[in-house]
Amino acid sequence: MATSRQLREQIAAGRWDAALAALYGGSEEVLARQRSRYGAALEQFELYYGPGRQVQVYSAPGRTELGGNHTDHQHGYGLAGAVTLDLVAVASRNEDGFIRVKSRGFNKLDVIDLTEAEPQQGESTHSASLIRGIAEGFRAKGCDVGGFDAYTASDVLRGSGLSSSAAFEMGVAMILNTEYGCGLDAPALARICQFAENTYFGKPSGLLDQLTSAVGGVLFADFADPTAPKIEKIHADGVLPEGMTLCVTDTRASHSELTGEFAAIRSEMEAVAACLGGKVLGEVDEKRFWQELPRLREQCGDRAVLRAIHYFEENARTLAQRDALAAGDFAAFARLVEKSGHSSFECCQNVYCASSPKHQGLSAALAISQSILAGTGGAWRMQGGGFAGTIQAFVPDALVKRYCAAMEALFGPGCCYLLSLREQGTVRVM
């Protein structure tokens, strides 16, 4: 194992170029940026924890949701792809029983005393709760984990719908898994992260984000049994045809104050399920749902019913999207992407907050996307939890410059990201 200084020298000399190219692509421009980025992270580690420490460096990708908007928590299907935007973590094991994590862009150094296993007062919704919950998740599986010191630098946009939280969680989990020789597989790590987010952080999330960051590639998941979802990996290579670029636009409004809006989607879907004898919509007979619409409207209200309609139709679309990608039929996939986007807007109603109609960044981004991309073979939709954050578009290369310029005119320079899908999940890089 090398020291932080030795790794910086090796990176600058190009000795880790092959490992970086496998994650980010092999162009000299890309490699130069990643050499600089990794070197800076190692320098920051030394600043906070001192020089001369033996370290390992990890990468945890963000994800873009490709299908299955708000279906996973109802025990439906999900489809997502890992992307080249990621979190990089430099870590070194310690023997004092504390986990210390300093994250770029945040002033606070998280210090977790591992003798305090229970959720701590005032810690929920903060990164410290995730770290504590992940450590406890390992212990619940019989893993004897201890302390480490880490510095993280994330390019995954916070509150953007690219799942910065899952990347952070998976980075922490991979550090513990590697430094303490736990040997847990990627799905097990993802479940630990979900446990931490649900129980310690206090967010009722599904599992798709963590699974995609853990496994990489394009991931199709069946959550009929959410404790043991069936997953199928579609290799990222060839998913996007030649001449098509994945663009993600940050509308620069955060998800961070929207937990109540997200929770309402789940609670309303589950209210409909309860009227039909189930806990979630995945347990409900769809034919009976359509037959009992008048009663459901009366008992649950129209928005809840519309969100349930979205679930059933989106679930079927997600299965069709998987089949289209597996068959290499991007045109069919793109048509389904558009339908998914319209359903999120019209039925799930998670493109803007009804209580704040003056602020509709996602709506504006989708409208401009439609004006540019309609009839071109491209596609566009909102992604993630919704209400704010990012939209996703598949843009023909000939239109990328025009498309990005239009997005930047609305949301400012640097808002439009050109992404690639990433084959690797969360890994130790060096």
What does each model-found stretch correspond to?
Residues 1-63, 88, 92-124, 220-381, ...:
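C-terminal nucleotide
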Residues 53-54, 70-77, 116-124, 154-162, ...:
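A short glycine/serine-rich beta->alpha loop
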Residues 76-96, 215:
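Structural signature of FAD isoalloxazine-binding scaffolds in flavoprotein oxidoreductases
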Residues 160-248, 430:
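Fold-level recognition of mixed alpha/beta catalytic cores in primary-metabolism enzymes, strongest
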Residues 135-157:
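Glycine- and acidic-rich phosphate- and metal-coordinating loops
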Residues 140-148, 176-192, 397-410:
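Phosphate-handling active-site elements
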Residues 100-102, 147-154, 184-195, 334-339, ...:
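Beta-strand segments within the central parallel beta-sheet cores of soluble alpha/beta enzyme folds
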Residues 59-75, 155-172, 376-394:
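Glycine/serine-rich anion-binding loops at beta->alpha junctions
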